[in-house]
Amino acid sequence: TAKGELLAIFDADFVPKPDCLRKLVDFFTDPLVGCAQMRWAHINGGYNLLTRLQTIMLDGHFVVEQTTRNRTGGFFNFNGTAGIWRRRAIEMSGGWQHDTLTVDTDLSFRAQLMGWKFVYLLDEEAPAEIPVEINAFKAQQRRWAKGVMQVGLKLYPRIWLAPLPYRV
């Protein structure tokens, strides 16, 4: 069990830059910041047509969607890797719950409902591999889609009823 105040999370296939943690930690001087998310980059983005298409899709999510949500104060989700969490934010939000496939999205939304702020770092990237084979890609997308639907059924009623700004 990790014991630190801040928890860095990286999947095994991610290759963060050696100085990335120093850059992310600075945001936690604000005691309300619960999570800092880096942008994903793609080690094998040019491998084949499938990886090129995924690069476009993922860049749309990370460059456009996550940036916009963060800059407008809207909810955005921690993408399961390439970031740092404040331990207290995880604990106060109910911890990692395993009733959805996308535990990252679930925890992200619960933490933001509790008032924790999230920071998205467009200029800090963590390169990783993306699926090069269609069946692996389809399985990944099915998991993500099912997980987000599970989170929706679990949390969207609370989100809609929460006294949050319209922009969320």
State what each model feature region is.
Residues G45, A128-E129:
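Generic structural signal for helix capping and beta-alpha/helix-loop junctions
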Residues T1-E5, P18-L101, Q112, I134-Y166:
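Long helical/loop segments within the catalytic core of UDP-sugar-dependent glycosyltransferases
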Residues D99, S108-P127:
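Catalytic donor-sugar/metal-binding loop of nucleotide-sugar-dependent glycosyltransferases
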